[in-house]
Amino acid sequence: MNRIKTLTLLLMIILSVGISAQNPRSVFTDRPVDEAAIYFTPENFNVKTDGRMDVSDALQEALNRTKQKENGCGILFIPEGVYKLSKTIYIPSGVRIIGYGGKRPVFVLAKQAPGFQEVTRETAKGKYLFWFIGGGYRPGGRIGDANAGTFYSSMMNVDIRIEDGNPNASAIRAHFAQHCSISNVTIHVGKGRAGIVDAGNHLEN
């Protein structure tokens, strides 16, 4: 009888964890008020939150603006919605991506996005959808990992989904250091390669 009770309890725990993973809770339901932050909204950028418009370039622009606005660091707030992506997004050092709303915002790598299929020397660990880097980002410039001198970079309260046709896609490269974190992020790898590569020093929920 005790064994049956134990097995029943374990099954209930497993089911509850599964339900929680499928329906992640948003930890920031209201729009935060921060005059120094940048908001990734249709009022500020040419974006739609329906998952049909590719917002890759707009998101990179928003991250670059955030890096340049307040002494090289800052927050980019992402409202609830679905955001289609098709290329690597570089997260500059000192920049935090924070989602908010009744549901977590979702970043979706589009089906068969260019470059996420083949394994090359540069993509041996996967082609990254999000890459935490050291310093800022500019097209054609040198790109390097976040390092021991990278502080405060983070991603919070968002979800990531990799669609089919991207077998070499890795959702996040998180080679970072002090006060950097990934928290309250659910990654649906699907048929992709990996969720997080070279994990940093703080991963939570």
Where are these regions (language model features)?
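Extracellular/periplasmic carbohydrate-active domains that bind, remodel
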Residues: S20-N205
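Bacterial N-terminal signal peptides that target proteins for export
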Residues: M1-T8
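Bacterial N-terminal signal peptides
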Residues: T8-G18
